[in-house]
A protein has these predicted regions:
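Glycine/tyrosine- and acidic-biased, solvent-exposed loop/turn segments at the edges of beta-strands
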Residues: 1-136
């Protein structure tokens, strides 16, 4: 039996669930419906700070997701469509300045991606095209 989708007593998980680290701090919280992750989910670091948050639809990452560093600063934002990166993604330097940004389609970088130094100055642009034969 898969403990990720089944409750301790056997049936598929249904409802709000939380899991804890060995030390008792919250590791994650979210909802299952018929054994599949659904709705908003939050994942935490051992220091208690939020690590990531986003949504699941029918067990797959969907919609906007956000990740954070151990100190709580924003690390990355992006979108998923059925567990695949799709839409604008941004990563941030530890000082909070934008590191890079661009777009994904079906898990592939497409179009212009821009990279910035820690002071915010544009240092590189690169064009990406979908690989032949891909779903992009």
């Amino acid at each position: 039996m898969d403990s990720d989708t089944h409750a301790a007593d056997g049936p598929l998980k249904d409802g709000i669930f939380k899991e804890y680290f060995v030390d008792g701090t919250l590791s994650w919280e979210g909802e299952f419906r018929a054994g599949e992750k659904t709705g908003e989910w939050k994942y935490y670091l051992k220091n208690g700070r939020l690590k990531a948050s986003g949504h699941f639809v029918a067990g797959k990452m969907s919609g906007p997701w956000t990740w954070y560093r151990e100190n709580g600063q924003l690390m990355q934002t992006g979108q998923f469509v059925e567990e695949r990166k799709d839409g604008v993604w941004r990563r941030y330097h530890p000082n909070g300045a934008l590191h890079d940004e661009g777009e994904y389609h079906a898990d592939q970088k497409v179009g212009e991606w821009r990279t910035y130094d820690a002071s915010g100055a544009l240092i590189k642009t690169r064009q990406h095209r979908a690989r032949p034969g891909s779903a992009a």
